[in-house]
C-alpha cells in the first residue's frame, strides 16, 4: 500500500514492491493477475482500514444521524495526519486510475459498503432523523458521494498546498464550512 501511496498508481513499480518483499515479480502477478489487481486489493484494504460511520462513540450516536456525520467530518484531518497511507490510496483510486479500475472500485464500494453507509442511513431513518419518503438507495448514494467529496475538499490544502489561496490557515472557517455542509444535507434529507 505504501508504494502506491508514495508514488501513485502510475508511478508505483511492481518490481520495487517485489524487491522489498524479497519475492519474484512473477509471484505478484501470479497472485494478483496484474498491477491493477494488486492496486485494487490495496484499495480494498485501505477502505476497510477507515472507520465506519457507526463506529462513532455511543454519546455521539445517541445524538443522532447528523451529529454523527458532523463528528466524522470534524475529524477528517486525522485521515491525512494519522492514516495518510490508506487515505492517499483511496484518493488515488478515486481520482487517479483508469476507467476499468475505477469501475471495479465503484462496484466494490456498492457491494461491500466498507464505510457502512447503508446501515448508517437506516440508523438515521429509524431514529426519525432522515425522511422516510425518500428512496433509501438514493439517500445512501447522496451521503456517500457528498461526504466523500466534501472530505476530499477539506484536506485539499494539506494534499496540494497553494491550491486555495484565500482564507488559508483559518480553522474557524473550516469549522463553519463543515457545519454549513451538515445543515445543507439536513435540509435536503432530514425529517
Show which residues each predicted segment covers.
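Hydrophobic alpha-helical connector segments
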Residues: 41, 56-85, 136-143, 175-178
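C-terminal peripheral helix-coil segments that are non-catalytic and often amphipathic
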Residues: 78, 111-127, 145-191
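Helix-turn-helix
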Residues: 3-37, 41-42
